[in-house]
């Protein structure tokens, strides 16, 4: 087995944003790679990839679901900040200060960061004690927005997907 190839493919697949309900790009990528290797993959109704890999007797079958954790915009706040609802088992404390991408249904992809509301440790005396939830965190867009109208003018709306940077690292010792 060519481990460099396997790790390269894994890193490529992990870099594709694919929270549940938004998996077409990842499933298409995986299907394309399997097709290039001479297999005949099929996509399931729910967005997974099914592929018979062959073999003698009982053939080996691959069934892959390619969804990851993510979020969806629940509210655009009056100050232009965004609250999200989790998709899958996403936890706010695990993604505080993480970079994210918002996929607008209308106008492209925008970047931002999930952070604690009132994130200044110099001003917020309870910063260290504040419970991190999706009610106490917000996405700050990397755009010059100051209001909900500014955000909507970009084409961003409630229901748009929010995907977090997976920060995939493969160490020299083989840890991923």
For the regions a protein language model found, what residue spans apply to each?
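N-terminal hydrophobic/helix-forming segments and targeting peptides
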Residues: 1-176
């Amino acid at each position: 087995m060519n481990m460099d190839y396997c790790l390269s493919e894994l890193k490529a697949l992990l870099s594709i944003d694919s929270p549940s309900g938004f998996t077409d790009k990842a499933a298409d990528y995986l299907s394309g790679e399997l097709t290039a290797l001479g297999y005949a993959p099929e996509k399931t109704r729910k967005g997974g990839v099914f592929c018979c890999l062959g073999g003698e007797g009982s053939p080996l079958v691959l069934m892959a679901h390619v969804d990851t954790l993510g979020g969806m915009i629940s509210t655009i706040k009056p100050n232009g900040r965004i609250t999200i609802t989790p998709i899958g088992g996403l936890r706010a404390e695990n993604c505080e200060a993480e970079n994210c991408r918002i996929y607008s249904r209308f106008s492209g992809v925008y970047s931002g960061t999930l952070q604690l509301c009132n994130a200044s440790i110099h001003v917020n005396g309870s910063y260290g004690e504040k419970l991190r939830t999706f009610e106490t965190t917000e996405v700050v867009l990397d755009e010059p927005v100051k209001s909900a109208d500014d955000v909507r003018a970009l084409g961003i709306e409630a229901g748009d997907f929010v995907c977090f940077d997976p920060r995939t690292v493969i160490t020299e010792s083989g840890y991923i």
